[in-house]
Amino acid sequence: MENMTSAILEGLNSEQKAAVSCVDGPVLIVAGAGSGKTRVLTSRIAYILERGGDPSRILALTFTKKAASEMKERIALMVGERKARRLYMGTFHSVFIRFLREFAESLGYPSAFTIYDTSDSISAIKTCLK
């Protein structure tokens, strides 16, 4: 585990290492574009997992599919695909639809449902108005 932890911290500056290795609660990362925020976030998740953290108790949200995909790939390379798959990680939409599907039945709703986009909604309204 020590070698893996060293590999996770390798290449990070002292502030980034401090953020990655702080596992006693949440950390707020505020930095400009291209400063390594995504690298810090993915390294921190890998660091927590390597220290025995439960992947299903980690939530990582991003705005774009591209960023989510990059984060998943980076973490899978650091800790393995099996652990990475168990994370709640992705865009706001993808993560929360996963929550809805996973827990809908326990709330008395079916887990099979469709979310309409604008076009679908307009089409449904037009059908109802006929």
Feature annotation, model-predicted:
Residues M1-P110, I115:
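P-loop NTPase Walker
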